[in-house]
Amino acid sequence: MGSFSIWHWLIVLVIVMLVFGTKKLRNIGQDLGGAVKGFKDGMKEGNTDEPATPTPAKELRDSTTIDVEAKEKSRQQ
């Protein structure tokens, strides 16, 4: 009772084809296939074998310079 046989699925398929039509189902299939292909292409672009080149770190300023500039700006206001 809980399991559907192949005949149940065929009847459901026939009803769906009658409701939506074969053209609409074909368009849905093409859209779904295009979405899957786009997803796979996106995954391939993200998995490149090229090692990521680290960006050179900028030289850090002395932290007192920022504090001095902030104090000077607050005095001017």
Swiss-Prot record:
Pfam families: TatA_B_E. The chain crosses the membrane at residues 1-21. GO terms for molecular function: protein transmembrane transporter activity. Residues 40-77 are annotated as: Disordered. The keyword Transmembrane helix applies. Residues 58-77 have a biased composition (Basic and acidic residues). Its main location: membrane. One of its GO terms (biological process) is protein transport by the Tat complex. It is found in: Cell inner membrane. Belongs to the TatA/E family. Part of the twin-arginine translocation (Tat) system that transports large folded proteins containing a characteristic twin-arginine motif in their signal peptide across membranes. TatA could form the protein-conducting channel of the Tat system. HAMAP family: TatA_E (MF_00236). NCBIfam families: PRK02958.1, tatAE. The Tat system comprises two distinct complexes: a TatABC complex, containing multiple copies of TatA, TatB and TatC subunits, and a separate TatA complex, containing only TatA subunits. Substrates initially bind to the TatABC complex, which probably triggers association of the separate TatA complex to form the active translocon. This is Sec-independent protein translocase protein TatA. It comes from Cupriavidus metallidurans (strain ATCC 43123 / DSM 2839 / NBRC 102507 / CH34).
